[in-house]
Amino acid sequence: MVVYIVLYTCLAGFILLFLVYYYLTHSHCPRKQLEGEETCVFIENGQKKSLTLEKWSTSDNIQITVIVPAYNESKRIGNMLQETVDHLEKYYRSSSSAGQRRWEILIVDDESKDTTVNAVLEFSNKLDLRDHLRVCSLKRNRGKGGAVTWGMLYARGQYAIFADADGASQFSDLELLFKNMPPGPRGGVVVGSRAHMVNTAAVVKRSFIRNFLMHCFHKLLQILGIREIGDTQCGFKLFSREAYQSIFPRMHVEGWIFDIEVLTLARFFGLPIIEVPITWHEVGGSKMTLLKDSISMAIDLLVIRLNYTFGIWERPSAKRIT
């Protein structure tokens, strides 16, 4: 009887390990690009035009690329774009008489069900932004991380930043991030942070359950060894060209927790990561389902840790920068 118990226990353990391994190796495979997703649209002289993008067709004329992931953001994205364009027009136009724009915005529409694309194009037409504001529509939803990753693969700027469509982060704080960008040809990653706001009204007035889950998430990060960054999830991160071209082709996670893999890969590559306090405010209309997405984030966090720890996902070294 004891022998059978031991055998069944070993068999059950083997099956469990196999299922865990299968989940780790198959659950977070980035979705392949679908036909037509590399085509973007923009407005020129009141007419909608299309353009097929090329991955990293870098241009020294573009100093900064702004990636904005968007899902059902027709009501919020206009204000964010106005603030963003106002800042970019002030700081990122050439000093020549023509005043050439040295910036671009790439909206990655993640299969929105509303009129997000039309709202962006109407905004672009009003300000005559032409192909400096382009919209790409994913044929099937990928999640925030997938949308950001997709956009970064087509960035052209010397630097690239992703910013949330709700405008919660003050876009003019981009200059704070630039001031803290590590010097040298490699650059690095500069992370906008809300960690300094933990005891402010913007956070305290949140619901008890939201603050409780936030603290649980931070504790889990500390347990898993991610301690050097106080706010990993703020949607306002700036990358040098070498940083974004090294990190994003190797991404696996496409959900809310993708920031953790971004920072993990940056650390593997030996890229400096600098955290900078920014101005931030709560904006209604969040797309997160609190309990469901919190559980999903915790699972994804463990998946990231286990896959890199056990070598299931390739762990790049600092010497391997491409």
From Swiss-Prot:
Record topology, Cytoplasmic segments = 22-322
Q: Which residues cross the membrane?
A: 2-21
Side Lumenal, residues: 1
User: Which SUPFAM superfamilies did the record assign?
Assistant: Nucleotide-diphospho-sugar transferases
Where is it localised?
A: Endoplasmic reticulum membrane
A GO term, aspect molecular function: dolichyl-phosphate beta-glucosyltransferase activity
Chief subcellular location? endoplasmic reticulum
This protein's GO CC annotations: endoplasmic reticulum; endoplasmic reticulum membrane
* EC number, as in UniProt: 2.4.1.117
The UniProt keywords, alphabetically, are:
Endoplasmic reticulum, Glycosyltransferase, Membrane, Signal-anchor, Transferase, Transmembrane, Transmembrane helix
Write down the membrane topology: Single-pass membrane protein
> What InterPro entries does the record tag this protein with?
DPG_synthase, Glyco_trans_2-like, Nucleotide-diphossugar_trans
> From which domain of life does this come?
Eukaryota
The record lists the catalysed reaction(s) as: a di-trans,poly-cis-dolichyl phosphate + UDP-alpha-D-glucose = a di-trans,poly-cis-dolichyl beta-D-glucosyl phosphate + UDP
Task: State what this protein does.
Answer: Endoplasmic reticulum membrane-bound UDP-glucose:dolichyl-phosphate glucosyltransferase involved in protein N-linked glycosylation.
This chain's protein is named: Dolichyl-phosphate beta-glucosyltransferase
Q: Which organism is it from?
A: Schizosaccharomyces pombe (strain 972 / ATCC 24843)
Biological classification of the source = Eukaryota, Fungi, Dikarya, Ascomycota, Taphrinomycotina
